[in-house]
Swiss-Prot record:
GO MF term set: GTP binding; manganese ion binding; phosphoenolpyruvate carboxykinase (GTP) activity
Cofactor(s) recorded in Swiss-Prot or TrEMBL: Mn(2+)
Binding sites annotated in the UniProt record for substrate: 89, 211-213, 260, 367-369
Record-linked Pfam families: PEPCK_GTP, PEPCK_N
Signal peptide residue numbers: none
Catalytic residues of the enzyme: 262
Catalytic activity, EC: 4.1.1.32
Stored SUPFAM superfamilies: PEP carboxykinase N-terminal domain, PEP carboxykinase-like
The keyword Cytoplasm is annotated on this UniProt entry: yes
Listed name of the protein: Phosphoenolpyruvate carboxykinase [GTP]
Keywords: Cytoplasm, Decarboxylase, Gluconeogenesis, GTP-binding, Lyase, Manganese, Metal-binding, Nucleotide-binding
Biological processes annotated in GO: cellular response to glucose stimulus; gluconeogenesis; glycerol biosynthetic process from pyruvate; oxaloacetate metabolic process; propionate catabolic process; response to lipid; response to starvation
Catalyzed reaction equations: oxaloacetate + GTP = phosphoenolpyruvate + GDP + CO2
């Protein structure tokens, strides 16, 4: 058996005999080396390996003992507070380590970045315990699986990992490679907050932060690593939900990509839940099949109420393992968040300290979160952990657009959908990133924040993936947020109709109207669906307000996106699709004018 004697001599000082035996059982020199190097760098007082249900319970206790989490009245519920300036993903402090300049990617020279973050991590765990968690991204015993190790001095971070990911110690036996994540909360000096992503070594370093988007490695930090892997290997690692929607001919699985805070989680609750956030997609025998790399949900809590979100509401109120973060803890040991239909409390504690109702400040942060296991959801699909994944028949790209995009459109083809819908996404920014709310930003596939490589290379892989498929999913563009003045033109429940129409398109049971930007529903089909699903009268005036094409606005958008992709030297196929779309729009403007109702195209 291969044993790193130098490693074991060092680790024996920090690790119990029981833990040493666990490492010996693995017989994995990469694991030994990773733990040793991190321990030597961060200088913890002890090391604890998280490999079993017993260890998960230990982490729960440590989270309470260290006061990183506080217990609440409801059994299994705890609350965590992040630093007031550490409430969202830190774009400006997150770097892809490469010597190349990449459009839209925050890069730093690899050598400089490694040197900087290692200096910040030096002795960062002094006086603390170092936790080592062994996980599987994706179902075990699956072609989709990627192994990962998270090292952290934060019980909250490891507790979150234990809820969100499959603990999988045994699969590290033998010299298997894995993704590596090193996190230390350090001194929580926000000026020295750094997240460094080293694609060359499949390693992410994170320091002086606890917000989960910056610290829980297997979440959005791992997404950068797996996107790069997917492009090299010809599959897709996506910021997408996976949902099974019921149709007349059975369950049809869709992926759904929305920017944060734009409807992805609520859409996931409309069907059978497999994933609310991430998807690994592979071509298997000519079919696109997908799995959820996770087994939990880290969701935005603001606005969740019993009427609009009954499933999530139930999950958050029943005895169950839940970590609330950056909401209000009430005096009687419960929680409150903005948009909840619980009674607003008079006072409590939040991430800024004492709060009272007369302070005229929100009780919770707009990016406050909940972390729960998938098994808590009553709409969980039976295939959520299927190692073979599920067949994807539809792909949804959704945005938060107040002015231009119609509620639902279907692409002419896979490449048309990828380029003119997915790769052309512009959406109002939300509080999940540090910056101004409601600013429009270019966000293709809702993944630009996590892009580790050239966007053109990523899109090229998407287009090639499409070509490999014998059975191609239909692609749809969704927009739940169209307004007339300051008034939304749709209710939250209306999304059920757009989803049902997409399902009927997959089943081939409704026809469409051809327009220059894609295929749109007939009024009569939507009227029927509104009546059947929502018991609601859908008028022809509603239809015209929602589906009249603002061709001048679509043209402006097309020009912006085309210019952008030309500047970054995107693949020729991307440019061609956008130029063809431009030609179609111009022809229709010449014939019908700048605004056109689908009723005039029948």
């Amino acid at each position: 058996m291969y044993i790193m004697r130098s490693s074991f001599n060092f680790l024996n000082l920090l690790v119990s005999d029981k833990m040493i035996k666990k490492i010996e059982i693995l017989n994995n020199s990469y694991v030994e080396e990773f733990i040793e190097k991190t321990a030597e760098l961060c200088n913890p007082s002890s090391i604890y390996l998280v490999t079993s249900e017993e260890d998960k319970e230990y982490i729960r206790r440590k989270a309470i003992e260290t006061k990183e989490e506080l217990p609440l009245k409801t059994l299994g519920h705890t609350i965590h507070f992040d630093h007031p300036l550490d409430q969202a993903r830190a774009r400006d402090d997150t770097f892809i380590l490469t010597d190349d300049k990449i459009p839209f990617v925050n890069t730093k020279k690899r050598e400089d970045g490694i040197r900087e973050v290692l200096s910040l991590l030096k002795d960062s765990m002094k006086g603390r315990e170092m936790y080592v968690g062994f996980y599987s991204l994706g179902p075990k015993n699956s072609i989709f699986q990627h192994l990962a190790i998270q090292i952290s001095d934060s019980p909250y971070v490891i507790h979150s990992e234990n809820i969100l990911y499959r603990l999988d110690f045994d699969d590290f036996k033998g010299n298997k490679q894995f993704l590596k994540f090193v996190h230390s909360k350090g001194e929580l000096d926000i000026k020295k907050r750094r997240i460094m992503i080293d694609l060359k070594e499949d390693t992410v370093y994170s320091v002086n932060t606890t917000y989960a988007g910056n610290s829980v490695g297997l979440k959005k930090l791992a997404l950068r690593l797996t996107i790069a892997k997917a492009v090299k290997e010809g599959w897709l690692s996506e910021h997408m939900a996976i949902i099974g929607f019921e149709g007349d001919k059975g369950t049809h699985y869709f992926t759904a990509s929305f920017p944060s805070g734009s409807g992805k989680t609520s859409t996931s609750m409309m069907g059978k839940l497999i994933s609310d956030d991430l998807a690994f997609i592979r071509e298997i025998n000519g079919v696109a099949r997908a799995v959820n790399p996770e087994i939990g949900v880290f969701g935005i809590i603001q606005g969740i109420n019993s009427k609009d979100d009954p499933i999530i509401w139930e999950v958050l109120h029943k005895p169950n393992e839940v970590i609330f973060s950056n909401v209000l803890m009430t005096e009687d040991g419960y929680v409150y968040w903005e948009g909840s239909d619980d009674k607003r409390p008079e006072r409590g504690i939040n991430y800024e300290g004492f709060w009272s109702n007369d302070m005229n400040k929100p009780a919770s942060h707009p990016n406050a979160r909940f972390t729960v296991p998938l098994t808590a959801f009553k709409n969980l699909d039976e295939n959520y952990d299927n190692p073979d994944g599920v067949e994807i028949e539809g792909i949804i790209f959704g945005v938060r657009d107040y002015d231009t995009l119609i509620p639902v459109v279907e692409a002419f083809s896979c490449s048309h959908g990828i380029v003119t819908i997915g790769a052309s996404m512009e959406s109002a920014r939300t509080s999940a990133v540090i910056g101004k709310g409601d600013e429009y930003e270019f966000n293709p596939m809702a993944i630009l924040d996590f892009m580790p490589i050239h966007l053109g290379e990523y899109l090229g892989n998407y287009l090639e993936f499409c070509k490999k498929l014998k059975k191609v999913p239909r692609i749809f563009g969704f927009n739940y947020f169209l307004k007339e003045g300051n008034r939304f033109l749709n209710s939250k429940e209306d999304k059920r109709v757009w989803i049902k129409w997409a399902v009927k398109r997959v089943e081939g049971s409704v026809d469409v109207i051809y327009t220059p930007i894609g295929l749109v529903p007939y009024y009569e089909d939507l009227k029927t669906l509104f009546r059947e699903m929502l018991n609601k009268e859908y008028t022809i005036e509603d239809y015209e307000k929602q589906f009249t094409l603002k061709l001048d606005k679509y043209l402006e958008k097309n020009e912006r996106i085309l210019k952008l992709y030309k500047e970054i030297l995107a693949p020729k196929e991307v440019i061609a699709e956008l130029e063809q779309q431009k030609e179609r729009i111009l022809k229709y403007i010449d014939k019908y004018g700048k605004r056109i109702s689908p009723l005039d195209l029948r």
